């Protein structure tokens, strides 16, 4: 099974991290690709791509620059995405397309309007990461949400996300929580710290270096099996 994750850019971000964790799961029988809509250009981008490629994930870079100024640029990127996605569809024939956050959501919606028959045999999964969607874009929200609801694609990451979405868009999405990987816990209250270093700094460093991941295989199976039953 060939799974394509659509993310905004190869850079640091919660949704990008979730997509990367799923793609790095190396589940038997699954081939993972990650596609960015706008070209990441932060200091973290090379590390992010290197991590994915080391795990055997194929990365598809965008030529559209990531301009962090106004959602207008994200909309332009989404409007230009269909031709690029057409090449991906013809070249790779994905079985599943999994979108994360509004820019990829909009890009896939535009593709579905330009090439409506290309997604007929493709399973669509859409993870909702935020409690607020499409701020200031009510008409865009109406179009995009109608598309994802028609594909039974929505998966919420928490109770608050599910409830917020249900209140605004009238659909109660199933929940698949973002998981936290097990890490060895140390008793920081009974260890000595270097001179001049406060214990809180050690604790914060532990939080910063803990490995966070998603229950990847289980999440995908539950999402796809749920959608298949609907």
Model-identified regions with their sequence ranges:
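N-terminal strand-loop element at the rim of the active site
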Residues: 5-73
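A short, basic/aromatic alpha-helical/loop segment that forms part
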Residues: 12-13, 134, 182-185, 219-224
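Proline-aspartate-enriched helix->loop->beta-strand connector
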Residues: 93-95
């Amino acid at each position: 099974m060939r799974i394509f994750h659509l993310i905004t850019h190869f850079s640091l971000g919660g949704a990008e991290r979730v997509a990367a964790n799923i793609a790095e799961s190396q589940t038997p029988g699954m081939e993972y690709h990650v596609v960015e809509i706008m070209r990441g250009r932060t200091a973290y981008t090379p590390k992010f791509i290197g991590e994915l490629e080391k795990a055997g994930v194929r990365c598809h870079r965008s030529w559209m620059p990531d301009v962090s100024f106004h959602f207008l640029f994200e909309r332009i990127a989404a409007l230009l995405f269909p031709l690029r996605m057409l090449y991906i569809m013809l070249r790779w024939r994905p079985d599943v397309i999994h979108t994360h956050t509004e820019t990829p959501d909009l890009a896939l919606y535009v593709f579905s309007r330009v090439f409506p028959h290309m997604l007929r045999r493709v399973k669509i999964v859409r993870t909702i990461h935020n409690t607020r969607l499409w701020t200031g874009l009510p008409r865009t929200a109406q179009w995009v949400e109608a598309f994802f609801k028609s594909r039974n694609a929505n998966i919420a990451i928490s109770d608050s996300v599910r409830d917020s979405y249900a209140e605004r868009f009238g659909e109660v999405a199933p929940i698949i929580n973002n998981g936290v990987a097990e890490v060895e816990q140390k008793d920081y209250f009974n260890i000595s710290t270097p001179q001049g270093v406060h214990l809180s700094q050690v604790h914060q460093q532990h939080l910063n270096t803990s490995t966070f991941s998603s229950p990847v295989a289980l999440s995908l199976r539950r999402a796809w099996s749920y959608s298949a039953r609907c």
